Amino acid sequence: MRFVVRLFPEISIKSAPVRKRWTKMLTDNLRLMAKRIHPTARVNKEWDRIEVTAKVDDPVVEGQLIDMLARTPGIANFSHVQTHPFESLHDIYELVQASWGDQLKGKTFCVRVKRTGNHDFTSTEVERYVGGGLNQNNPTGGVKLKDPDVSIGLEVKDDQVYLVTKKYQGLGGFPMGTQESVLSLISGGYDSTVASFQMIKRGLRTHYCFFNLGGREHELAVKEIAFFLWNRFGSTHRVRFISVPFEGVVGEILQKVGPSNMGVVLKRMMLRAGERIAERGGIEAMVTGEAVAQVSSQTIPNLSVIDSVTDMMVLRPLIVMDKRDIIDISRKIGAEEFSAAVPEYCGVISVKPSAKVNRAKLEAEEEKFDFSILEHALENAVVQSIDEVMDDAQELAEVELVSELPVSAKVIDIRHHTEQELRPLTVEGREVLEIPFYQLSTAYAELDKAVNYYLFCDKGVMSGLHARHLLDAGYTNVGVYRP
């Protein structure tokens, strides 16, 4: 199988050295991910495109490669193509007729051709010859150059013709690793999740900083989201997850700060802490999911007061986006179910928030704050590599792990529905239930308590985490299946 990948247009207009460097980065990223899918996968770079091939005829591998290409930053679009040698225009027509003739009945169509190499014909001549032949020899609805029912794409390159069987939309953006690193202050809600995704899409290596206000379960939920974003969109580059215990900071704010200023002061404390953590990691910018006037702490006056505590750049990719559009992006990238289950803790300390705080009064209240508590939180911050972020042996110690299923046990595939569709799980002689992780806690209550269920995911990380959740909830009939 063969795919032709087109660069995101903003890459194509860069200077020759930059374009060459960024195209190489995208090629390296694709090569790394393609090899994970199949050992025969090859990625070859050319000036205006990248070709991905695999010496295997397997629809599962094909689906995995399509999914990988669709979620890789830096790609405008990509096409599944078939290559054939040719000697004449009529050879090209016959190839197209064999592939497309049966699909044109009663439909309008057009033929689009790109050509490179030395030939005695032009791209337009190929379009006319092939299009005319198709129209004469098939019961079509006629040629229509604008908005046809079927658009047939082909590329003539030297002595080969590339027939496009299907075209796919890419993610856009810049290749991961072409830009600098940023630190995303992630809470797990829609806003910070989508903001993190937008930075990854733009090619920035995005590290995660989580201020824990809600205890262990909140932290594990946010780790799931960060791991999902990294694993799906940025796994070619390692990043870190930093968890900062912020309960003490919140407690101090509740005691020392008036109700109208609490939300803004909390954000100021987060930026102070985030700046310190970023500097430790050599990171030059922080990222937040704030949008103008979405809540009272996010008005222009209040954002100005919040930003005044740091000299570091604070990036806000969602600053003028509507909440509906943010949720739509979350849904599109597969993160909506994660964020919908994460409680928003920042708002609980703002009883009567002010949309325009008095800076002098706020700073006077902040002077009462015991900053040793903030220092203590920073000293106790936990730094983990993102690929190990949920692989905590102590937390998973009580979970039964099996490679062979006990008699009468059933398997629950808890992977995201897109992964279930791409790589269906089959276990000979056993029933496999497909219950995505975000539905598991609700669905598990309805299952037969006399049956033992073993959770499955690709790496055993998510399954171990959710098995632990169920054990904590009082269920004893749960384990992890690692074949």
From Swiss-Prot:
Residue ranges constituting the Rhodanese domain according to the UniProt record: 405-483
General function of this protein: Catalyzes the ATP-dependent transfer of a sulfur to tRNA to produce 4-thiouridine in position 8 of tRNAs, which functions as a near-UV photosensor. Also catalyzes the transfer of sulfur to the sulfur carrier protein ThiS, forming ThiS-thiocarboxylate. This is a step in the synthesis of thiazole, in the thiamine biosynthesis pathway. The sulfur is donated as persulfide by IscS.
Keyword annotations from UniProtKB, A to Z: ATP-binding, Cytoplasm, Disulfide bond, Nucleotide-binding, Redox-active center, RNA-binding, Thiamine biosynthesis, Transferase, tRNA-binding
NCBIfam families: ThiI_C_thiazole, tRNA uracil 4-sulfurtransferase ThiI
Residues holding ATP: 185-186, 267, 289, 298
Cellular location(s): Cytoplasm
Catalytic activity: [ThiI sulfur-carrier protein]-S-sulfanyl-L-cysteine + a uridine in tRNA + 2 reduced [2Fe-2S]-[ferredoxin] + ATP + H(+) = [ThiI sulfur-carrier protein]-L-cysteine + a 4-thiouridine in tRNA + 2 oxidized [2Fe-2S]-[ferredoxin] + AMP + diphosphate; [ThiS sulfur-carrier protein]-C-terminal Gly-Gly-AMP + S-sulfanyl-L-cysteinyl-[cysteine desulfurase] + AH2 = [ThiS sulfur-carrier protein]-C-terminal-Gly-aminoethanethioate + L-cysteinyl-[cysteine desulfurase] + A + AMP + 2 H(+)
Transferase among keywords: yes
Taxonomic source organism: Saccharophagus degradans (strain 2-40 / ATCC 43961 / DSM 17024)
Protein name: tRNA sulfurtransferase
Gene behind the chain: thiI
